[in-house]
């Protein structure tokens, strides 16, 4: 999965807030029905520590230990650990999204005495569970924190300012840029909606964000064959198959909470993409 720079900026604002009080979104409480649907009371193998499932999952899973891989969609690192991208990673946020981080000991000096802030919320406080996943996108600079009241808006405004600066200094290059694809245009619209969200005190349940249809574009701007909603309330998001050019659902393909095996319903992707590229201005 390839994410645009714009989406990574917003993911950073949501997932990598510098302090617990700055997190924008909180998971809703787990209902008795959701908890009862968990497969057994605990994972089969003994765990050093149990944590809540990734995202807003309700079922207990084994925490990742020091040195194990981690990311946005993996189980959280155990207490006292953080999920760090590999040193020198060019796209640290994307590495975390792809699960290419590594659990390591917290560097408290980088976070302004995290013990004073409270490193983790107990797992039984599910009513107020934070979607933190112990992620760190890169080395933090003391005092270089986003404003508390609008981290999301700050990230969006910063990206807009960068776009304006690039457009002013590279007008000749802008004229040569190819037209944005349909997938990229839809992604821009979703980001605009996110930047305009008004939640009480800039907080709210994750459904406000997860309910948005965020398109999954590849590195060339086409739709990825498989599109999925994010997991929420302990359930995996639904996945379906689309045409990479138009984004429309492929006829006969299923919508499932798993792998819809899109390759069975789309057999000539390269030919169609080449034809579309030749027709594009």
From Swiss-Prot:
Q: Which compartments does it reside in?
A: Secreted
Keywords annotated in UniProt: Developmental protein, Disulfide bond, Growth factor binding, Growth regulation, Secreted, Signal
Q: Per the UniProt entry, what is one GO biological process?
A: regulation of insulin-like growth factor receptor signaling pathway
GO CC annotation, single: extracellular region
Q: Which SUPFAM superfamilies match?
A: Growth factor receptor domain, Thyroglobulin type-1 domain
Q: What does this protein do?
A: IGF-binding proteins prolong the half-life of the IGFs and have been shown to either inhibit or stimulate the growth promoting effects of the IGFs on cell culture. They alter the interaction of IGFs with their cell surface receptors.
User: Could you tell me what this protein is called?
Assistant: Insulin-like growth factor-binding protein 2
Q: Which organism is it from?
A: Xenopus laevis
Q: What is the lineage of its organism?
A: Eukaryota, Metazoa, Chordata, Craniata, Vertebrata
**Name of the encoding gene:** igfbp2
């Amino acid at each position: 999965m390839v994410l645009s720079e714009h989406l990574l900026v917003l993911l950073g604002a949501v997932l990598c807030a510098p302090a617990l009080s700055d997190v924008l979104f909180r998971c809703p409480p787990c209902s008795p029905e959701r908890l009862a649907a968990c497969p057994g009371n605990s994972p089969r193998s003994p765990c050093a520590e149990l944590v809540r499932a990734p995202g807003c999952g309700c079922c207990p899973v084994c925490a990742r230990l020091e040195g194990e891989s981690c990311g946005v969609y993996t189980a959280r690192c155990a207490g006292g650990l953080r999920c760090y991208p590999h040193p020198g990673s060019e796209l640290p946020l994307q590495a975390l999204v792809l699960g290419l981080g590594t659990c390591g000991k917290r560097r408290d000096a980088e976070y302004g005495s995290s013990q004073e802030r409270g490193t983790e919320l107990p797992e039984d406080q599910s009513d107020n569970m934070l979607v933190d996943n112990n992620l760190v996108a890169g080395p933090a600079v003391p005092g270089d924190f986003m404003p508390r009241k609008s981290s999301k808006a700050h990230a969006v405004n910063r990206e807009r300012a960068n776009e304006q600066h690039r457009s002013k200094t590279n007008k000749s290059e802008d004229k040569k840029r190819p037209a944005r694809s349909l997938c990229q245009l839809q992604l821009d619209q979703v980001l605009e909606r996110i930047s305009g969200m008004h939640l009480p005190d800039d907080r709210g349940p994750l459904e406000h964000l997860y309910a948005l249809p965020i398109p999954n574009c590849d590195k060339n701007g086409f739709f990825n064959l498989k599109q999925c909603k994010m997991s929420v309330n302990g359930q995996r998001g639904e996945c379906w198959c689309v045409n990479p050019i138009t984004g429309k659902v492929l006829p006969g393909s299923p919508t499932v909470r798993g792998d819809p095996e899109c390759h069975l319903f789309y057999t000539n992707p390269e030919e169609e993409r080449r034809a579309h590229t030749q027709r594009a201005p």
